[in-house]
Amino acid sequence: MKFNFNETEDAPDSRRSPTPKEPVRWVPLQSHPVFASLPSSQDEPAVSQLFPRNFMAWDGDSRVYYWDSRRYLLHRLSLRLGEPEPSSVLAAVPSKVMQPDLQVTFSVSKISINKSGSAVLLAGSDGICVMYLFGRASVIEDNVICRVVSIGSEIYTSSDSAITLLQASWHPDSDTHLGILSSDAVFRLFDLSSDTELPEQEYYLQPGEPGRSRTASSIYPADFSFGGDHLWDRFTVFILFTDGSIYILCPVVPFGSVYKWESVMEIYNDANMYGVKSSNSLAVSNSSLAIEWLEATFPDLTEQGTRGENILVVKAQPYALLDASLALQGPLYKASSGDGDEDFAVREAECKGRAVSLLYNLVSKDSILVTAWSAGQLQVDALVDEIQPVWISGNSSRLRMNSHNKIQGVAMICESNISELPVATSNLPLDHTVWLGHPPPLLRLAMVDLALPKMREGGSLVTLFADSLLPERIYSLHDGGIDSTVLHSLPFTSQASGKDEALKTPSVHTVLSTCQEESAVSPLLGFVPLSDSFGYSWIVAVLSSGECIVAEMKTWDLLLPIHVSTDKTVSSSAIEKKEQENSCIISKELLAGPKIRIAPHALPNQRSTPANSVEGRSILLDYVKLFHENYIEYAHKVHFELQHHAPNLKRIIDDQHQRLAEANEKISKVEKNQSFLEKRIDKAIERHDSLEQCLQRLRSLPGTHKKPLTRAELDFKSELDQYAGVEVDALQSSIETLRARVKKSTQKSHKGTVVAASQKKQYSKKNLIQDTQMSQLQSTLAKLSLMNSDNSKKVKIVESALKSQESSFM
C-alpha cells in the first residue's frame, strides 16, 4: 500500500517532463560524468566524522541516487543491470538533477530512500529532512525543484538544542514513518503523513537498574536497527549502547502500517496456546497483555467471524496500554553463561573501543545481530530464543489525543526489567522460560577482526550493510575501505536442513582498500550494493577523488568454504602422477611389443626338418600366418597411435618451448634487476645495523631498567584508556543534553512568569487597583533590593575578616 500525502494541485511547470537538452546515452556507471565532476579530496576540511557518511542510495529497482554535498543537489541515475553483458552496469547520461526548494541548513552525512521510492531522507548529526521526489515540483534550468520538509526542527535543528542525531532510518513496514535515535537517549518515531514536528511515538530509554549504572557508556546509545519479517521481530527495535550492550523494545508498531494477516495470526495463536494456558501466573499476565494489545491494535482478530475469511492484510490502529509502559528488555546475555557481569568482562576482553554500529539480519530461520566496534571487531550473534513483548505495570504512558478522542501520539519511559526477573540460563526447558519476560539469549557465532589501522583517537566508524541477494554476506564500510564477511553455518538454518555440523568460521575478504595512512576523513563518500533478478550482484563505491568503482560480487557456491589440504606428500605425488599421465604419448602395451611367440621352443631330441619338404613348407606357412596376425596388426596399431598423438605431441612441444621462452625472459629480468636488488639488500643491511645501534643506545637509557607494570597496574591503565576513549565522550554528550534541557525549562518557566504577570496585571485592572498602590509596591521592592545588597556586602566583609583571623592563628 502506498500513501500519497503530496498536494494534489500541480504547478503548471510540473505537467512538463523536464527532458534534458542532449539525447540520452548509456555509459558504464564507473565512467559517469557526475562522479568525475566531484571536487578533490584535498579541498575537504579534515573534520571529525561523528555521523556515518553515505551519499548513495538505491531504490531496489533501477535507480541510484547520489547527493552532491558541495552543491546541495540530488542526482538520480537510471541504470541498466546486466546489459549488454550479464556482469555490466550501464547508467544514463545526463542524469536527472533534483534541487531542494528550501535551503538545507545542516551538513548532510547520509541519504536513504523509502521502499516505494517516493521520498529521500537527508540526515546529519545536526538535523534531518525529507525530500519528496514526486508530486508538486517545478523545473528551473533543467533542475527539478522538489519539496523538502524538516523533521523535528524544534528538537534537532534548534539553536537552543544540544541534541545530536545518532541514527535515522525508514521503517521497513511503512513509507511514511521514520525512526530516529538521538544523544538524549530517546527513540522517536515520526509519521510524515500527519505531523513532521511532533513525533508519533517517543520512548525514553532508561537502561540498567536505577542508581546502579556501571559506566557512562552503558547509558549512552550508539545505534538501532529494526527487526525483520519473523514473528515478534517485525514489531521489535534493537538498541545498541556504546558499551556493547543490546536492548529490545517490543512491540513498536507505526500507526497505520500494514502487515500480513498470516503473520499477525501466527503470533496471536502462539500467545493463546503457550501463554494463557501456562501454569505460571507471570506467563499468563504477560501473554494476556500481549493478546490485549494485539486485539486492540488489529481489531480484525476479533472481527474475523463477522468479516469472513478473505483477509490478506491488516492495518495497525493507534493504541497504547494506559497503566503500563514497554520494558527495555536487556541487556542480551550470552547463551553459554547467565551471569551478566561475567559476560561483560568477556566482551570487554574480546572487543576494544566502543560499539558504533548494529545490524539486524534475517537469514532463513536465524535472527542475526552484528555489532561493530570502533577498533575494527565484528561481533556476530544469533538469537537463541524468540522475542516476546514485555510491559511494566504501573508506569503509565502519556497520550496525545485529537478532537475525536483518537490517539495521535504516545510517549513513555522504558526502564529495564532485569531486576524483576530471576537469572536465566540456557539449560532451562522451554516451558520454564516462555512468556516469563526473559530477554532472548545470544549465541556467539564468530568474532571477526578487520585489522583496521588506528588513524584517530575515537577509532573508526564502521557501517554495516546486508546483501539483498545473499543475506549471509555482510559488508563493512570503514575508514580503510570495504570488507565482505560471509557466514557459512547458522544454527537453526543448518538444523532445519538436516545438517548437524559444528559452526564454521566465516570467511572475510577485502573488497576495496583505500590505503588510508594519516587522513582524518575517510575517502569513501558513498556505497551501495546492487542486485538483479538473475542472481547477479555488484557493489558501487564512490571516492572523494571522483573515482567510481563497480565490482561484480560472486554469489554461486559462495557459501561453500574452500578446503585447503595440508598433506604435502599427497599433493606432490598427485602432481607427479598427473605429469606422468600427461607425458604418456603411446601406451605401454604398444611399447612392450606383441606378447605371442612365433617360434616355439625346440626340443633337444627333435630332428631338424628341411625347408623344401612337405612338413617344412607347412611349418613355414604357419609361421607366415602367425607373423601376419601379430606383427602386421601391431604395426598398424603403432601407426594409428602415432598419427593420433601427433597433434598432442606438437602441443606439448609448443608448450615446452613457450615455457622455455618465459623462463628465459624471467631469467633476463632477474639479471637486469640483480644489481638493483643487491643495492636494496645493502641498504636493508645498513638500516638493520643502524636500528641495532639505536636499540643498543635505547637499552642504555635509565628508563629501560624500570620494573614492568603489575597486573593490577595494567588493569588500571586499561580502565583509564577506556575512560579516556569512551566515557569522556559519553559524559560530555550527557552534560550538553542536560544543559539544553535546563535552558529549555528555564525559558519555559520565564515565559510562564511573563504570562502570569500579564494575567495578574489584567486582573488588577479589572479590580481598579490604583496607580499609587502600584508605585508603593515598586518602591517597597526597591528598598528590599537595596537592603538585600547591603546585607550581601556585610556578609562578604564578615567572611573576609574570619579568613584573616584564621590565617593569623595558623
Swiss-Prot record:
Assembly information from the UniProt record: Part of the nuclear pore complex (NPC). The NPC has an eight-fold symmetrical structure comprising a central transport channel and two rings, the cytoplasmic and nuclear rings, to which eight filaments are attached. The cytoplasmic filaments have loose ends, while the nuclear filaments are joined in a distal ring, forming a nuclear basket. NPCs are highly dynamic in configuration and composition, and can be devided in 3 subcomplexes, the NUP62 subcomplex, the NUP107-160 subcomplex and the NUP93 subcomplex, containing approximately 30 different nucleoporin proteins.
UniProt xrefs under SUPFAM superfamilies: WD40 repeat-like (SSF50978)
PANTHER family to which the protein is assigned, alphabetical: NUCLEAR PORE COMPLEX PROTEIN NUP88, NUCLEOPORIN NUP84-RELATED
Phenotype reported upon loss of the gene: Lethal.
Annotated compartments: Nucleus envelope; Nucleus, Nuclear pore complex
Entry keywords, A to Z: Coiled coil, mRNA transport, Nuclear pore complex, Nucleus, Protein transport, Translocation, Transport
Tree of life domain: Eukaryota
Pfam families: Nup88
Coiled coil: 646-748
This protein's record includes keyword Transmembrane: no
GO biological process: innate immune response; mRNA transport; protein export from nucleus; ribosomal large subunit export from nucleus; ribosomal small subunit export from nucleus; systemic acquired resistance
Name the record gives this protein: Nuclear pore complex protein NUP88
